[in-house]
Regions:
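N-terminal "cap/leader" segments of large eukaryotic alpha-helical scaffolds
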Residues: 1-38
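Boundary/linker elements of alpha-helical solenoid repeat scaffolds
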Residues: 3-16, 45-56, 99-111
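Alpha-helical solenoid scaffolds in eukaryotic proteins
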Residues: 21-30, 63-71, 88, 119-126, ...
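HEAT-repeat alpha-solenoid elements in large eukaryotic scaffold proteins
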Residues: 37-49, 89, 96-98
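Conserved hydrophobic register position within alpha-solenoid helical repeats
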Residues: 42-44, 81-85, 136-141, 171-174, ...
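Residue-level signature of the C-terminal ends
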Residues: 50-54, 71, 75, 92-99, ...
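Short sequence/structural elements of tandem HEAT/ARM alpha-solenoid repeats
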Residues: 59-68, 101-105, 115-119, 152-160
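Glycine-rich, aromatic-bearing surface loops/beta-hairpins
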Residues: 153-195
Length: 195
């Protein structure tokens, strides 16, 4: 296990999932602790299908978002776990409420997931300061860029990254996300344009 991880579980039975598919309760543990990329990716696919396939967010995305943030910020992830956990948060941050979820009464799931991320931005920014993997850091730039309503805080964060000569993925993501925020007028919201 990575860094003394205790079990990370989500009660999939208590939330709506895509097509009613309920992953094994221990899938989050595997996602976080496995050193094998194929095992982590398989866990990612099971989680994605249940909660955020094709960026269509199910009710399950709400507790999942909180769990993913905890994984990132607690240092509980293996290298591949962190890589795919931030990718999952990236997909959720860009998501929209699944049409069938809205019909079932789950309106605003996407904005509620982004709100969970927004509430944890100080922790995510602090964690980003210790991440050296370019792909993972680029994902955090995107996640914070589409959720942080505080333009000064986000610009300070990205400028600090630029001042330390980030990798090409991070530098490109800062440029692209800054341009997107300018076009969008700030962070993401349900129904905003992703162009």
């Amino acid at each position: 296990m990575a860094n003394g991880v205790s079990e990370m579980r989500l009660d999939w039975g208590s939330v709506r999932t895509r097509d009613g598919v309920k992953p094994d309760a221990a899938v989050l543990d595997v996602f976080v602790t496995s050193e094998d990329i194929d095992t982590v990716y398989d866990a990612y696919c099971r989680i994605e299908h249940a909660a955020f396939y094709n960026r269509d967010l199910e009710e399950a995305a709400l507790p999942l978002t909180s769990a993913l943030i905890e994984m990132v910020c607690s240092g509980r992830c293996t290298h591949w776990g962190l890589h795919w956990v931030t990718d999952a948060l990236y997909e959720i941050s860009l998501g929209q409420t699944a049409p069938w979820e809205a019909e079932a009464g789950g309106t605003g799931v996407a904005d509620r997931c982004r709100s969970i991320i927004r509430d944890n931005l100080p922790r995510l920014y602090q964690t980003a300061g210790s991440i050296t993997d370019d792909y993972t850091l680029a994902s955090l730039v995107s996640i914070t860029g589409v959720t942080d309503p505080d333009e000064n805080r986000w610009n300070t964060f990205t400028q600090k990254l630029l001042d330390h000569d980030p990798g090409p993925d991070t530098a490109r993501e800062i440029e692209d996300t800054r341009a997107w925020r300018t076009r969008n007028g700030g962070p993401a919201y349900e129904g905003c344009s992703w162009d």
